[in-house]
Structures are given as structure tokens and as C-alpha cells.
Amino acid sequence: MHSSATFDVIVVGGGHAGTEAAAAAARLGARVALVSFDPTLIGTMSCNPAIGGLGKGHLMREVDALDGWMARAADAAAIHYRMLNASKGAAVQGPRIQADRKLYRAAIQTLLAAEEGITVVAGEAAALRLSNGGRIAGLDLADGTALTARAVVLATGTFLGGRLFRGEERMEGGRIGEAGSHRLAGQLRAAHLPMARLKTGTPPRLDGRTIDWARLQEQPSDGGRWTCSTWNNARTVPQIFCAITRTNAESHRIIAENLHRSPLFTGAIGAAGPRYCPSIEDKIHRFADRDGHQVFLEPEGLDTHLVYPNGISTSLPADVQLAMLRTIEGLEAVEMVVPGYAVEYDHIDPRALDRTLQVRAMPGVWCAGQINGTTGYEEAAAQGLVAGANAALAVQGREPLILDRSESYIGVMVDDLVLQGVTEPYRMLTARAEYRLRLRADNAATRLTPKGIALGLVRPATAALFARRMAERARAGALLEAPVATADYGAIGLPLPGDGIARRRIDLLRFPGATVERLTILVPEIESIDRAILSEVVEDAHYAPYIARHEAELRALAANEAILLDPALDYAAIGGLSREMVERLSKARPETLGQAARIDGVTPAALTAIMVHSRRRAA
């Protein structure tokens, strides 16, 4: 690397947020520098070797719909597919895969190498370079290299001020064996940005050759044909099984007797951890009445013996970890390869960001991933795409990419973060989306790809695939929307309703016992339609009556969303607002009345006062 170089966008960090940010900016035509401590580790899965899940699978598919990399890499590395909530409606089903760590990292690095607009820079990000006017001008590396750019995306993960804990051990770093980013953390704190600490953890890694698999409950890969990426229709990697075991009373006794050695209970770690992924010591403490907790044994790859025991994240001392492990069925003789640990790191209060994920007080700086207070690969990837795209669009003087919560889970997450902030690592859940009936994982491309194409965020090759997909979708719709004749009921074994209601072919699928397979008797052409596309059309029809009930609510909300609020609005000058309301609104700085309505604690009366005040000023 030369002593200086000029780019449009600099991305700091080569994890899930950083790679998607760099890729999005490059797809929009920006010259991108991707700065990483160690480029050989770009795309590493730091914790669990899995992509997707409940809510998270929706984010994965939405990133894919906008031509991101995560789902493609997941398919290239998937050694175990599983559709979570498969027995429930499609709106809350979550596609999830178990990945071969090496294959996933290799897939990301292959995609990176093929992207001409990205230059990978090895080094430590030491300080943001600011112009005299306080706007971003680039980045200084620890070795003295100066990178010039008008936009920087910080995707620092757990490395920003990272510190590791295991029992009495304390280590500086963002991941075991890797240094943290402390100079950059110091600069951000010195800039008086609102910052705090959060915590996450990881379980020990086990030697699969020392596990008695024969005694455990197997969990096979799904036999279906679904894939992570809409643009991929084949599974190419050999499939393996995972296994399930449980902790027990003896496991809990060992943990309880050693809580005084856990940094979570000694006060060494004061930061909040992820609510939906607690450590095993936290589980034992909070749920003392439980006689056991499930542990999912997940192989980390096809050519490794390492196994990830999902469900027992811990920062207990290594000797306690091993003793606890050997009380679990199937693990009585297990060998621990790497002990678990916890990591505490800096994050920025996401309420300091606007909806593009730009730092309001530091124009030209965008943030994505754990620096914004989230947890999870999928949450990070989605933010990376938004931040990277908006950084490039800003440099080009174009309108930003804003995804609404009514059209995407990405929009839900960004809205939640910039309005509500976080007190613990934020994880996406389907329950967070009030429009979840329409935001299914299977229709992400139909919802979002047109927007990506319009922006230039979707490559021509993917746009061509989308056009073919939509043509196929239209053909499926035409076949299924055709009217049903009286004789058709008997032809597929259904009783004649006798209610005189005119029905379409697709309506027959609401009858008990009716299936798409039986419908092919009436419509043989259905056999030639891609099953994923056909399923999406059928689910659209199933959900249509329920979605229709929400339309009035959506129109009412849209009316509120349309009322823009002045970014410099003096809430203290609005009559009828309590001091508490003024403080909440001044901190969150909502951009629309609809956003103001979702700020925790803001009352309908306060919204009315703001609306009246805004309309008076606009008159």
C-alpha cells in the first residue's frame, strides 16, 4: 500500500457488515477501500457457524433481494438446511443453514476478489481524518498510511475497544488471538459521541471425535429444495446431521458453585449481553427451576472435527467449562479444543444516527453492525448494505436508500435502532414487525428487488434473473386465477360447496385436503413452474384476506408518516408537551410524525400537539 490513496468510500472492518457495505458501495459505482487487520480473515464467522433463523432469515433474504452476498455465500457453504417454524404460517417461518466455516469465508473472499471496485487494505484503522469544517476527509492507519475519501463506514464489530474475559483471565482484543481497535475507540469517545459498552460471548469448541454421537438425538438436514438465495436453485454441498443433548442437575451444580469465578457475576463485566442468547451461567441463575437446557451440537465443517455446542455460551474458567461439559450426555469423554469466552466492546447509541445510518454529529461517517448495538450476522449484513449504499449515494449526490418498516425487516430494524436506541444487543424477531403478514421471507425479492434495480444497487445479471422470475410468477398467477367450473371440484376429489360463490383455482387450496399436487390434475402446466415461485403465489393468496384488514391501518399510518418534522424543531416551544416528552423527542429527533409515534413513552396527546404545531408552521 502506498503512503496515501484516494477512494470514494472507506469501509473499516471485514466482517458481515463490512463486506456487505463494501459490496453495496461498489455495485453503485464507488471506488471502495476495505480496511481489515488481516485480509485472510475477511468473512470469518466469529461465533456460531450458522446463517438465518427466525426474523434473521428474513434479513438474509432481504439482503439477497438487494443483491448482497450473504445468502449466496451461505448456499456455497451450507452443510445443513433447516426451516424453523415449518409447521406455522409462511410469514413467521425462518430459513436457517449450518455452514462450513472455511467454505463460507472462502465464498465471501471469492465474491470480494471478483468485485473490481473494491481495494482491500491491510492495516489498523487508527483515526478518522477530518477537514477544517469537521466533515470526514478519510482515514489514517496505524502504519502512517493516509486514505482519502468523502465517506467512511465503520463496521468494527466487537473490535472497537474490545476486551476478552474468561474466568480470572483478561485480554485485550475483539476476537480470541486478535487485537482490538483502541485508538479509533478513543477518538470517537473524545468526539463526545454517545457511547456505551455491550457484551457478547461464545461457547467452547469441542473435538467431535470425543463425542458419543450414537447416544444423541440426530437432527437431519431438511429434505426440501429451498435455498438461501433467491438467485440460486440448487444445493451443492454435502449435507450432514447435527445432534441434540441437554444439560442436567449435575451440570447446573458445577456452574452454580463457580458463579463467583464468572466475570459476569464478579462485576468484571458490567455491560448488558444479548437477551435471546444468554450465557449458560446466566440461564442457571435466571431459570433456577429448570432441570435442563437444550444443547445443539453443530459440526463446524466437512473437513474439521470441531463442534460448536450451541446453547452454552460461557466465560467461566476453562477448568469449570470442561467439568461442566463432561456431565452432559454424550460428552462424558469430550475434549475441549478452545474454551468459551466473553467479549465486551464499545458501541454508539444508534439514536445518534439518521435513517441512512450516518452519524448526525459527524457528517460523512456511517456505522453498521455491532457498533450500532445489534447482535447477529444477519443484522450486521443488513445494516452494512444500508450504510454502504448510502455512503456511495451521498458521495454521488443522489437520494438516499430509505427502507420503510412497512416494506422490509431492514426498515423495521433501522427504525427501531435510530428511534428507540438499545439497552442490550438488538436482535431481529418477527414479533418486531407489525406488517409481518406481508413481509415473508419467501417474497423478499418481489418486495425489494425493484427498488434495488431502480437505484442501480442490483447488478444487470441479477436484474435479468428477477425479470425471468417475475414472468414466471405472472404465468403462475394467470393459471391459478382462472375460474373454477362445477366439474372441477369432483375432478380433484373435493365436495361441491353448493353456496353459489364463484371461485378461482387458487381458492380451492383453502379447502381441507386440497394441495398443489392435486390441483395439477386440473392444471398440468403447474408442474413446469418453479416450486419456490409457485409457493409464493399460493401464500400471497392465502394471506390476502388477512392483509386486506390492515390496509386501513396502513393508510392511516402513511398519513402520519407523510408529515415531515423539522430536524431543528424546538420541542420545548410546543405547548402541551411535558418535560419528559421534550427530552425523549429531542434525543430521538424523529424525521416524521410516524417515527415520533413509535418512540417509547410518547403519548397520543403529545403527537397531536406536534402535528398541530407542524401544520401551523407549514401554513
Swiss-Prot record:
Q: List the disulfide bonds.
A: none
* Protein residues bound to FAD: G13, G14, G15, H16, A17, G18
InterPro entries according to UniProt = FAD/NAD-bd_sf, GIDA_C_N, MnmG, MnmG-rel, MnmG-rel_CS, MnmG_C, MnmG_C_subdom, MnmG_C_subdom_sf
GO MF term list: flavin adenine dinucleotide binding
Residues given in the record as NAD(+) binding sites? 273-287
Question: Which keywords appear in this protein's UniProt record, sorted alphabetically?
Answer: Cytoplasm, FAD, Flavoprotein, NAD, tRNA processing
GO BP of this protein: tRNA methylation; tRNA wobble uridine modification
Q: What is its main location?
A: cytoplasm
Please give the Pfam families that the UniProt record associates with this protein.
GIDA, GIDA_C_1st, SAM_GIDA_C
Keyword match Chloroplast: no
Q: Where in the cell is it found?
A: Cytoplasm
Cofactor(s) the record lists: FAD
Q: What does UniProt give as GO cellular component?
A: cytosol
Q: Which NCBIfam families match?
A: mnmG_gidA
Q: How does it assemble?
A: Homodimer. Heterotetramer of two MnmE and two MnmG subunits.
- According to its UniProt entry, what is the function of this protein? NAD-binding protein involved in the addition of a carboxymethylaminomethyl (cmnm) group at the wobble position (U34) of certain tRNAs, forming tRNA-cmnm(5)s(2)U34.
| Family recorded in the similarity comment | Belongs to the MnmG family.
- Under what name is this protein listed? tRNA uridine 5-carboxymethylaminomethyl modification enzyme MnmG
What is the protein's species of origin? Answer: Sphingopyxis alaskensis (strain DSM 13593 / LMG 18877 / RB2256)
For this protein's source organism, the top of the classification is: Bacteria, Pseudomonadati, Pseudomonadota, Alphaproteobacteria, Sphingomonadales
